[in-house]
Amino acid sequence: MGMRPTARMPKLTRRSRVLILIALGVIALLLAGPRLIDAYVDWLWFGELGYRSVFTTVLVTRFLVFLVAGVLVGGIVFAGLALAYRTRPVFVPNNDNDPVARYRTVVLARLRLFGIGIPAAIGLLAGIVAQSYWVRIQLFLHGGDFGITDPQFGKDLGFYAFELPFYRLLLSYLFVAIFLAFVANVVSHYLFGGIRLTGRSGALSRSARIQLVSLVGVLVLLKAVAYWLDRYELLSHTRGGKPFTGAGYTDINAVLPAKLILMAIAVICAAAVFSAIVLRDLRIPAIGLVLLLLSSLIVGAAWPMIVEQISVKPNAAQKESEYISRSITATRQAYGLTSNVVTYRNYTGDGEATAQQVAADRATTSNIRLLDPTIVSPAFTQFQQGKNFYYFPDQLSIDRYFDRNNNLRDYVVAARELNPDRLIDNQRDWINRHTVYTHGNGFIASPANTVRGIANDPNQNGGYPEFLVNVVGANGTVVSDGPAPLDQPRIYYGPVISNTPADYAIVGKTGADREYDYETSADTKNYTYTGSGGVSVGSWISRTVFAAKFAERNFLFSNVIGSNSKILFNRDPAQRVEAVAPWLTTDSAVYPAIVNKRMVWILDGYTTLDNYPYSQLTSLSSATADSNEVAFNRLLPDKQVSYIRNSVKATVDAYDGTVTLYQQDEQDPVLKAWMQVFPGTVKPKGDISPELAAHLRYPEDLFKVQRMLLAKYHVNDPVTFFSTSDFWDVPLDPNPTASSYQPPYYIVAKNIAKNDNSASYQLISAMNRFKRDYLAAYISASSDPATYGKITVLTIPGQVNGPKLANNAITTDPAVSQDLGVIGRDNQNRIRWGNLLTLPVGQGGLLYVEPVYASPGASDAASSYPRLIRVAMMYNDKIGYGPTVRDALNGLFGPGAGDAATGIQPTEGGAPANVPPNNAPSPEALPGTPPSPPTAVPPAPEASVTLSPAKAAAMKEIQSAIGAARDAQKKGDFAAYGAALQRLDDAITKFNNTQ
């Protein structure tokens, strides 16, 4: 049967072609239109911020990389196709059984489409992928030296950081391009008769043989280059079963020689492949390729495995000793843990302390932090929210200021931001949402070492934070009662206000003031934004662009937008910093501060590498995970790093959105490279004002990475390192509701870096022994300007209780558990344990402090905010417990120990400070010490006063409760005493409410 005639492609009419072109144009517009709009909006946004050079540099770099990579890969593939076509056989036998004849006809009919379209498509894809590597290329072009050489090849580390990644990228693209050219060449020769799979002779034309052999030879040469580069990558290699990163004994003595041998074999094989051009014998290159494959299996895989199993494993500690030492040195360099940064000191951890010694530690005892920033947010909401649309984050921040007596104190701080998601009813209307409710109002700070009033029951008036507020007052002036003066408390930029899909506000003078600002007793006062931030939307072009950007027609039709209108968008501080510095990794925490009478958001930025020779490779998400990060879902991306520097401090003005980047690490070669890529975007460290320096803090995420590494890399001896016997562990959070590691804590305490009693703002963490619950070390990182970044490690030799054991001892103490059982009222009230702080006090001792909160009911509603109810402490197996820090210290160390402790502030109702309410235990009411009976009760009526029967009965109940409390005191029965206090509280309430 004859073969069916080859079908021809149908011809399109003119109308069909026009319709297809229109359809393609519409598709292209739909695909490219949003991207063009986004690019134009970004151009406007970067220009408004003063960072347009960043936008243009990144855009031009991406375009050039796209162009070069696309032309390179597409050109090589095109060359493979073109050579195959131009050297095709003049006569191609065409019998009826030829399976490719039909395809050959189709290709010949659309030769330009296939000959240009296929390379263009491949080049397009290659360019799209390559442009994402613009960071690697810019570092190659601008990277410099580290001034440190690797211990194996003697090359400066700048080669590994900046050059080697580029060489590997270039090699990968060349390999892919040549391979695709080889495939294209094979297909073309097969299609046009250069390769025939039928018949006994002429299976491969001369031109096909030359071209294919040449391409295979180039691939083998590229493989030889890859073997050469593999040698350097061994120094940042991780292999299973090896307790360190980098080349070990097997890598240096087996894998490294194997790479050189394989490189030589690859060069020989390439020569054998090229020989087929002249010798016309394909068996020689085939033998060469088989030899290369076998060599890679025997020399590259089998031989190192034999060395590892026979020579290394039986004597691993000794064999790997030299290379472990290399890893210890490199890891300390890469993570900023060298001897000029980290100081180790011996510390007993269980030294005895007298009341006088504890009182002398005034910087510590007067600053014991009672407010847990993860717990007190509902109290901020209850007392300071004001309106339904204002909001405080669930986790607040810690910063320090000098109080009115010029004492350094730590504060729980928060900005009262506007939360668009909390708008209700007509507030959600587009005009109200984007032109009326535009900003927050106020900076709130609470001294972390005190509360207002003593509460023995969560329903009492006490135990809540003392609030220092900077806010726009009822008369329109700024009330500046906060820890520092603030000229402009309005907040247009922040992490809360931006946490919504439609993150923009339209501001500017278009008639009467429109923006909600504050309320008086008579009416609502509005405001008009006067800051420099924002992109103009006064022209119809801008209105059209933003209407398309946000898919909102009101930009075109609303009369609230005028010639002076501006749009504020991209208002998240971290995202703004990441946009203007795309080479930075930002810390998960951003905190507000008052600097030079302006409210700013402060962020930490990191420069990182993932190929620092011999340095431990670390996952940022794993290293920075703790109970707070897990609870509030703030985990960093799963990025692998082997080098990190807190190279940049960034500020974002809360009013006008100005982003300022400051150089923090003046020695970081990675930062220096980026400062050359984007000149003028990062200000020198000398531009950091003293006012800003006073609020910079050691970054939390960096500290968590460093403490995880210090758990291993504090060890100097490589044999001990290999045995892991002296490793440490990051302790788990002892709080029963936590599910991860204990977070580090910012505190003000005595200066560990200077080893004196001056007050110091520091970030601290306890460290456990490996797989044990006993303390191994105490780490403190200084945030003071004079000693910023200095890390002090107190090593603890004995068996000192770690956080878990301390928490267990406190919570299971009979007196504590009985008292909290009374307060909890059989789970009718919720008891919450605050952060467990570890504080060095006295001469070599460690004090554990854990505040206790209680809230009415079992819910987390703002109306049932937690109140500080007790303070629990532990020192050398002894428990201190009471309503105040002073009480707990006196009970733990004896009278006078708490003399320096900060007192309780008066309640809003005016109750005097440091005076327990009617049913509060006196300072002696501590475990092991019977409390004094309560005496503050309603005054007895004068003889001439006749009480109603109900009041007389209530008075008898009060007297009976007092008697029961005194009896419990004599017996030392703490549970009975607590029950008597509760009876007394109920009786007093009944007396006051009875007519």
UniProtKB/Swiss-Prot annotation:
The superkingdom of the source organism is: Bacteria
Chief place where the protein resides = membrane
For the region Disordered, give the residue spans: 900-948
Keywords carried by this UniProt record: Cell membrane, Membrane, Transmembrane, Transmembrane helix
Membrane-topology annotation of the record? Multi-pass membrane protein
- The transmembrane segments are 18-38, 63-83, 113-133, 175-195, 210-230, 259-279, 287-307
* Record family assignment: Belongs to the UPF0182 family.
What PANTHER family does this protein's entry cite? Answer: UPF0182 PROTEIN SLL1060 (PTHR39344:SF1)
Q: What is this protein called?
A: UPF0182 protein MMAR_1371
